[in-house]
Amino acid sequence: ELWYTGNYKDPETGEREATQCVVTSTDMEHFKKQVPPVIARQPEGYTAHFRDPQVWRDVDGSYRMLLGVQRENLTGAALLYRSSDLRTWECEGEMTFPDADGAFDAFGYMWECPNLVRLVDEETGEARDVLIICPQGISPEREGFENVFPCIAIVGELVGTELRGADGSFEEVDRGTEFYAPQVMARSASSDPGAPTLLFGWAGNAGEDDQPSIETGGWVHCFTAPRALTLRGG
């Protein structure tokens, strides 16, 4: 199954609609679209910037979906949904950060491409949940966050909808100017415990006019090489 966001923008009014969709395939050549979309619109309190689903199976056997959203007050967040059959979804609410002292309450104007991955800290041996997001609207600093839109990692432990232990600190996933929108791929620990957790991203960003690669190399947008993820020291 391939999960994606269906985006429609009215050419006359400019109004946007976003739906969460799935297609299925047995051979990765022929695809069948699930109609209607599994999530037809965003919940109350959010704009139509509602996209980028990540779906995984939880330890209790149910399925969860993580989405990037924009609140009506024009701040970014991540929403969690739950399902028993991958077709009917119930919104659980926003991912919250009870130990971050409000650091992520108004953190950029949109969170794109959220991914949640569990990694074992190589220094402590503890399993940790790592939230990877691309928060639009973060100001560049003297050193770092100089990408058009940065990609960051927040470390904690997901309990329900709370990412506990995340204290407000975060790290850039990549410090270059041509990295965005990564997707994480991992085998289940039970099926292949030694398999690496891989990350692919865009080598490029949203607008052609802002890309250094246009003038220097005559290209824009491609995938990065795969990267194996590790966590050391939280």
Predicted feature residues:
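Beta-rich carbohydrate-recognition and catalytic domains
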Residues: E1-D52, R57-F107, V120-R175, S190-G194, ...
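Beta-propeller and closely related beta-sheet repeat lectin domains
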Residues: A48-Q54, E112-N115, Y180-Q183
